[in-house]
Structure formats: C-alpha cells, structure tokens
C-alpha cells in the first residue's frame, strides 16, 4: 500500500484553518515532487485511494530532522515555509510533506510521531 504523510509543527499554535492550509501546501508540493522522481508510486497511490496521514512534531528542530531523514532515504518530499501574512512569523517552517510512497518506507521515518 502507498500513502502520503504530512507532518505539522504543533508548537506554532496555528488555528485549525491555518494548519489545514499548511497541510495542503505540503501535500501538493510533495505530490508534485513525487510525480517527477517516482511517477509509478503516484499512479499506485492514486489507484489505491490516495491515503494520507497527518502527524505532528513539537519544534522546528524535529521538523528539520524529519525532512533530513526523508531526503537521506530519497523519498519525495516538501518543506513548507510560511509567508507570515496571517498568524505566524514570516519564514516560519510549518510542515513537511512526504510521498506518496510505500507505507513501509514512510513509516521508517515517521514511526515515532503521533497523529495530529
């Protein structure tokens, strides 16, 4: 099975709408990256119903560690930096999108994270 994971910073105390927007940015950007580097994974994921899981971290440091590990493993990903026009400081790192890719490859990096 294939999935996409979105990891959101919980320490920024974004409103629900803001979190949803950041998750969407991460999802779309990771999807576009996956289309370039792993089109077959995208095809399988699309055919399987586009499973997504949204997880949380509690700091920028944790978010960057996830992003680093995902890159080391060669998974399609995105790192989202907010423009800062509404709730948070400009340039704040808010989310990481991972995949779509095989669940076991993603869970290797995200297995210790909790659901948002």
Curated annotation (Swiss-Prot):
GO molecular function: peptidyl-tRNA hydrolase activity
Enzyme Commission number, as recorded: 3.1.1.29
Claim: Cytoplasm is one of the keywords in the record: yes
A Gene Ontology biological process term: translation
This protein's record includes keyword Cytoplasm: yes
One GO term describing the cellular component: cytosol
Reactions it catalyzes: an N-acyl-L-alpha-aminoacyl-tRNA + H2O = an N-acyl-L-amino acid + a tRNA + H(+)
CDD domains: PTH2
Localization per Swiss-Prot or TrEMBL: Cytoplasm
Keywords of the record: Cytoplasm, Hydrolase
Coiled-coil annotated spans: none
InterPro entries registered for this protein in UniProt: Pep_tRNA_hydro_II_dom_sf, Pept_tRNA_hydro_arch, PTH2
One Pfam family hit: PTH2
Family: Belongs to the PTH2 family.
NCBIfam families reported for this sequence: arch_pth2 (TIGR00283), PRK04322.1 (NF003314)
Stated role: The natural substrate for this enzyme may be peptidyl-tRNAs which drop off the ribosome during protein synthesis.
Name used for this protein in its record: Peptidyl-tRNA hydrolase
Organism this protein belongs to: Methanococcus vannielii (strain ATCC 35089 / DSM 1224 / JCM 13029 / OCM 148 / SB)
GN (gene name): pth
């Amino acid at each position: 099975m294939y999935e996409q994971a979105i990891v959101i910073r919980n320490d920024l105390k974004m409103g629900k709408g803001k979190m949803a927007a950041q998750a969407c940015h991460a999802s779309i950007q990771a999807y576009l990256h996956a289309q370039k580097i792993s089109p077959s994974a995208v095809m399988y994921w699309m055919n399987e119903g586009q499973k997504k899981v949204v997880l949380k971290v509690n700091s920028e440091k944790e978010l960057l560690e996830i992003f680093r590990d995902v890159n080391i493993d060669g998974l399609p990903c995105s790192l989202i930096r907010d423009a800062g026009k509404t709730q948070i400081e400009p340039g704040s790192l808010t989310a990481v999108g991972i995949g779509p890719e095989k669940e076991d490859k993603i869970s290797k990096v995200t297995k210790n994270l909790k659901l948002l």
